[in-house]
Every structure is written in structure tokens, then in C-alpha cells.
């Protein structure tokens, strides 16, 4: 099989022997794939940066049997601000785990990759509340996956009178269920945080850059 040129971002990096790495990469056309980066741990390796967690770049791959191998990489964005901030790194790692669960191999992941990159950009380059960013990410991802969050009733019990929005569960809750959720915000009008989360999650231009 010939070489494949694709953009991608590293979701997971694992050491393999003394000098190599096994990576999980999200690409727009191939979906989530596993690929080996030979010699990536060597100090002078051309793959040293391109094989790191959250590196987004232009990759040249080739496939042997069932495994992809990285020939070369041209890094585009490494999200440096996330790497140096523990809080930002925690949230970026959390959304990465969600992306891992939501994607598969051999499926078009263009829109999910776009959402993931835009969310990482928001975490890295802005001072927006990280819980807000996470909640909007979850709402937008659910929409991409074909799941519409409940709006008119409580996520937990189905009560119609909902007064709180859960940042943790990305949906509305009644006053009783909200007592068990520290991330629930009282809704008092369209301009409050909870409604901003919902409207941002529904807006196609949210996180666009």
C-alpha cells in the first residue's frame, strides 16, 4: 500500500520499547487509527514533537498489514498553553477521553475533529470558564452523534418543571435532582450562564476559528 497524507491529532501516546511509540490518532477521513512511530523517543528524531499528546499536524503514513506507520510529520499546532497549565490539561484530557469513546476507525470524523480542535483552541487561547467550555463541547458532540439533549424535562426524573442546568451532565434538571449536582446552575432568564451554555451548544458558529 502506498503512502497516505492526512492531517491528524494525537489522542494517546504509549511507549513501545526503548525508542518507539504506539499512537492513537484522530484523522478526518480515516477516523481514529493506531499508528507506530519508530524512533520517536530519540532526542534527534524528526517525529519527537509530532508523536506527542495533542500535537495536530500533517502526517505521511504507510500501512503494513493492519498497522499504520508514520513516515513524517509537519506539526501545525501543539497547544503549548494547555501543556503548561494543569487545569487546562485536565479538561483537555477529559474531552480527549470522550473523543476516544465517540470515534472509531474507518469512519468520517471531519466534524468531530473540527469540534475537538476548536474546543482545544478555546481551552488553550482564551480565559473562558472551563466548565462552560466542557458543557458546550458535550452538547455539540451529542448533536453531531445524533442525540438531542432533553430540554423540556429533568434529565433524571422527567419532571416538567426544570429550573437548573447541569454543567456536568449537559442538560436541565428539576430543583430536587439539582440538589445532588454541584454543577447545576439556576436558570433565571435567557442571559444567565445555563442558557448561554445551551444556546452556545446549539450555535453552529460556537468555537469557530
Task: Name each region found by the language model.
Residues 1-209:
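Non-catalytic alpha-helical scaffolds and adjoining flexible linkers that form interface surfaces
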Amino acid at each position: 500500500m502506498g503512502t497516505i497524507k492526512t492531517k491528524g491529532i494525537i489522542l494517546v501516546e504509549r511507549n513501545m520499547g526503548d525508542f518507539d511509540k504506539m499512537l492513537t490518532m484522530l484523522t478526518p477521513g480515516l477516523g481514529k487509527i493506531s499508528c507506530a512511530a519508530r524512533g520517536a523517543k530519540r532526542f534527534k528524531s524528526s517525529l519527537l514533537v509530532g508523536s506527542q499528546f495533542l500535537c495536530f499536524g500533517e502526517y505521511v503514513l504507510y500501512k503494513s498489514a493492519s498497522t499504520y506507520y508514520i513516515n513524517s510529520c509537519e506539526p501545525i499546532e501543539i497547544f503549548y498553553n494547555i501543556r503548561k497549565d494543569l487545569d487546562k490539561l485536565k479538561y483537555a484530557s477529559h474531552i480527549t477521553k470522550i473523543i476516544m469513546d465517540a470515534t472509531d476507525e474507518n469512519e468520517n470524523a471531519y466534524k468531530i475533529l473540527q469540534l475537538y480542535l476548536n474546543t482545544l483552541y478555546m481551552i488553550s487561547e482564551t480565559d473562558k470558564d472551563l466548565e462552560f467550555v466542557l458543557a458546550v463541547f458535550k452538547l455539540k458532540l451529542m448533536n453531531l452523534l445524533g442525540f438531542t439533549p432533553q430540554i423540556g424535562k429533568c434529565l433524571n426524573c422527567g419532571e416538567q418543571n426544570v429550573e437548573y442546568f447541569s454543567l456536568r451532565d449537559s442538560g436541565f434538571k428539576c430543583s430536587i435532582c439539582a440538589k445532588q449536582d454541584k454543577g447545576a446552575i439556576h436558570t433565571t432568564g435567557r442571559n444567565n450562564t445555563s442558557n448561554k451554555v445551551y444556546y452556545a451548544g446549539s450555535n453552529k458558529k460556537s468555537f469557530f476559528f
